[in-house]
Amino acid sequence: CIYANDLNPKFTGVGCARKIGMDEALRRFLHVNYDGIICCFDADSIVQKNYLTAIYNKLKSNSYAGASIYFEHPILGNSFKSAEYENIILYETHLRYYKNALEFCGFPFAFHTVGSSMAVKASAYAKQGGMNRRKAGEDFYFINKIIALGNYTEINTTTVIPSPRTSDRVPFGTGRAILDAL
């Protein structure tokens, strides 16, 4: 359990939360001298049963610094309004179109940068100075620092299912995009 109190409100947000957790994971890996894998995940996301084994199998013996993990937002159900499901379809289509356009143009660093679906080796995390404390976009900036190391990859053998929920806590990102579209 990690207990963090007296946090400066200027820095509290998803970036700060990820940083606290990832820094603690790094500390624990350093304590046992192990270059472990640090996974990022959102509390309201779900995953396939093979999530951990798929990540471990891809990153364990390879020289990969990190990976973007395949994701699909839910598009049907009773947990959210139909408009939220409709808007997440549009938003995710935009994300996939953007990444595919980068690939089509030959951009060598065309990866999804979704915070709930990324993993990084502890050594790469330390080498790049850890996670930033941004209130939004922390995943984008962090993943691009890891990609710059080279040997970044995708894991398409499992799926993260992030929530399509709205959010007014961040200036941009999935939750804000869904909220603004309603």
What are these regions (language model features)?
Residues 155-174:
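Active-site donor/metal-binding and catalytic loop motifs
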Residues 1-35:
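Active-site-proximal specificity loops/subdomain of glycosyltransferases
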Residues 134, 146-161:
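Catalytic donor-sugar/metal-binding loop of nucleotide-sugar-dependent glycosyltransferases
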Residues 179-182:
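Terminal low-complexity segments of carbohydrate-biosynthetic enzymes
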Residues 32-36, 41-58:
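Acidic donor-binding/catalytic loop of UDP-sugar-dependent glycosyltransferases
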